[in-house]
């Protein structure tokens, strides 16, 4: 009977150890996924900032061109 208890405790202990190792690996994988998502978000934000600045510059150039045309038409 004592032998069976020892075997049962050993099996339970090894099961708990492997479960904790699996959970740790799962957390590490989730952290890596979160970091990858953060990197992709930063890239998207950078791209959108560039588009925003280009749009502003194009708008200002168009406004200046229209203003010059109006000024020339008034003269």
Swiss-Prot record:
It comes from the Eukaryota. It is found in: Secreted. GO terms for cellular component: extracellular region. It holds the Pfam family DD_K. Keywords: Amidation, Amphibian defense peptide, Antimicrobial, Cleavage on pair of basic residues, Secreted, Signal. Residues 25-44 are annotated as: Disordered. Expressed by the skin glands. Its main location: secreted. GO terms for biological process: defense response. Residues 1-22 form the signal peptide. The modification Glutamine amide is found at residue 72. Residues 23-43, 74-75 form a propeptide. InterPro entries: Dermaseptin_dom, Frog_antimicrobial_propeptide, FSAP. Residues 30-41 have a biased composition (Acidic residues). Belongs to the frog skin active peptide (FSAP) family. Cruzioseptin subfamily. Has antimicrobial activity. This is Cruzioseptin-8. It comes from Cruziohyla calcarifer.
């Amino acid at each position: 009977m004592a032998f069976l208890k020892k075997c049962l405790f050993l099996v339970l202990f090894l099961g708990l150890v492997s479960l904790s190792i699996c959970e740790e690996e799962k957390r590490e994988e989730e952290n890596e996924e979160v970091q990858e998502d953060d990197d992709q978000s930063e890239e998207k934000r950078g791209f959108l900032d560039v588009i925003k600045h280009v749009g502003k510059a194009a708008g200002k150039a168009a406004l200046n061109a229209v203003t010059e045309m109006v000024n020339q038409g008034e003269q």
